[in-house]
A protein has these predicted regions:
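RNA-contacting regions in translation and RNA-metabolism proteins
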Residues: 1-196
Length: 196
């Protein structure tokens, strides 16, 4: 989903979209250990202020000792994109990381890259989500599973994941794991309940 909250003139749109992409890529590469579930970017109507809100499972890693890491991110982003714009970075803690598809995907990637058997990883991820209160979860892994010659797709679903119901709160994430055998694609669908 798009997590950019701003409008612009037609001619400025590509540049602002590229700025958003630069911000997201930089923050994700700089702070992989912080467990970032989403990055929201909003701008005011005159494009004079950029507000970046980072939702993190481990905000203390993102902020760093005495705010050092966050200050480094701020200064680099200021040089890269802010041409006269005021940049504000907010960090919000994700209270339940096991109910975020993005973080579940990161956990699966981390385990698969450590060469843990894929079926065990999927079952563990599903169990963690169900304990956290998810009503349903579906996880799919595709590629050379356990180093097999022929690539295949495997998935496990527990509970219900209604993808056709509009009021269903379904969180989705797509990840890639770079293993010694090649690239594995991971998809996570997490059903948190219905929005009334």
């Amino acid at each position: 989903t798009h997590r950019s909250f701003w409008f612009s003139k037609f001619k400025d749109y590509p540049q602002l979209l590229q700025e958003d992409s630069i911000i997201r890529e930089f923050i994700n590469t700089k702070s992989q250990a912080a467990g970032i579930s989403k990055i929201e970017i909003s701008r005011d109507s005159y494009n004079a202020q950029i507000i970046v809100t980072i939702h993190s499972a481990r905000p203390e890693v993102l902020v760093g000792k005495d705010g050092l890491t966050l200050n480094q991110i701020y200064s680099v982003l200021n040089k890269k994109i802010a041409n006269g714009q005021k940049l504000t970075i907010n960090v919000q803690e994700v209270l339940n990381p096991d109910l975020q598809a993005e973080l579940i995907g990161d956990f699966i990637v981390e385990q698969l890259e450590k060469r843990v058997a894929f079926r065990r990883v999927l079952k563990l991820a599903i169990a963690r989500a169900r304990v956290a209160g998810a009503e349903g979860i579906k996880v799919q892994v595709a590629g050379r599973l356990n180093g097999a010659e022929i690539a295949r797709t495997a998935w496990i679903r527990e509970g219900r994941v209604p993808l056709q119901t509009l009021r269903a709160d379904v969180d989705y994430a797509s990840k890639r794991a770079n293993t010694t055998y090649g690239v594995l694609g991971i998809k996570v669908w997490l059903f948190r309940g219905e929005i009334v």
